[in-house]
Design a protein with these regions (language model features):
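Gly/Thr-rich phosphate-binding beta-strand-loop-beta motif of the actin/hexokinase/Hsp70
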Residues: 31-56, 62
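ATPase catalytic-site recognition across NTP-hydrolyzing enzymes
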Residues: 1-37
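Phosphate/oxyanion-binding active-site loops and adjacent basic polyanion-contact surfaces
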Residues: 9-16, 47, 99-111, 128, ...
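An acidic- and aromatic-residue-enriched active-site/binding cleft used to recognize and process polar
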Residues: 41-45, 56, 69, 128-133, ...
Length: 247
């Protein structure tokens, strides 16, 4: 991958993104009973790790939520380096601080299972970067989940990365207002190659401007795009119009 240019991924659309938030309770009511996709972004066990869930609503909008995980013992250090309130966000339910000094992946598995059960949703596929999460993927598959490896190259990631931003620009996204996901999106840098392909990156490899929750959303969207439903326009149109529309 040879980058030709870099700029902020959500430049010019962060205000739109923030305006598309709804209260958490309202968000969960929107997705109840739907089928969706999960994405997971696994980092080093001492850093931020994330899962995300995306759903196509009947009106054609994409519903997006994401959750972070971090070791409890490193949270204070990361609050100083990253300059964000992880412990406060954990109390508000936007992330989970796992006991000890490394992230216990059992908490991620439990969160994926509980999210599906508690909200009455059906997760069709769990999407992973196989390089980082191979063992975890095998465990999830053994538990009966459908897992998909998402290759982290330009051909796989460019289109969904562009499409997500386009959906935000069009107002076709709804989310639960997670300050952690919003922070990750605001940090993400768009790396463009000579063919115009893009992918998300941090500004520097060891940068504290983390993007993990945004990366998890894109992993899920790779598969959700393959299965994008046509919006249900029946509530907006009469039968005569629908007959013409669908032939």
């Amino acid at each position: 991958w040879q980058a030709d240019s870099e700029e902020k991924y959500m430049a010019g659309v962060m205000d739109k993104w923030k305006a598309l938030a709804v209260p958490r309770k309202e968000f969960l009511e929107l997705i109840r009973g739907l089928e969706g996709w999960a994405g997971v972004d696994m980092s080093k066990r001492i850093d931020l790790t994330a899962d995300a869930h995306v759903f196509w609503l009947p009106d054609g909008r994409l519903a997006v939520t994401a959750h972070g995980f971090m070791p409890e013992e490193t949270a204070t250090k990361h609050e100083h380096t990253d300059r964000v309130p992880y412990k406060h966000w954990a109390r508000e339910g936007w992330c989970t601080l796992t006991p000890g000094s490394v992230t216990d992946y059992k908490f991620i598995a439990n969160h994926l299972d509980e999210f599906e059960f508690d909200n009455g949703v059906t997760i069709l596929e769990e999407c992973y970067d196989g390089h980082q999460a191979w063992h975890f993927m095998q465990e999830r598959e053994a538990a009966g989940k459908t897992v998909v490896e998402i290759r982290q190259g330009a051909q796989t990631l460019s289109e969904p990365t562009k499409y997500f931003r386009e959906l935000v620009f069009q107002g076709r996204v709804v989310h639960d207002g997670s300050p952690l996901l919003t922070w990750c999106l605001s940090n993400a840098v768009e790396v463009v190659d000579s063919n115009g392909n893009i992918k998300l990156s941090k500004k520097h490899k060891d940068d504290s401007q983390r993007i993990d929750l945004a990366a998890a959303v894109i992993n899920a969207l790779v598969r959700a795009m393959v299965n994008e439903a046509q919006p249900d326009v029946s509530e907006f149109a009469d039968e005569q119009f629908l007959d013409k529309l669908w032939g």
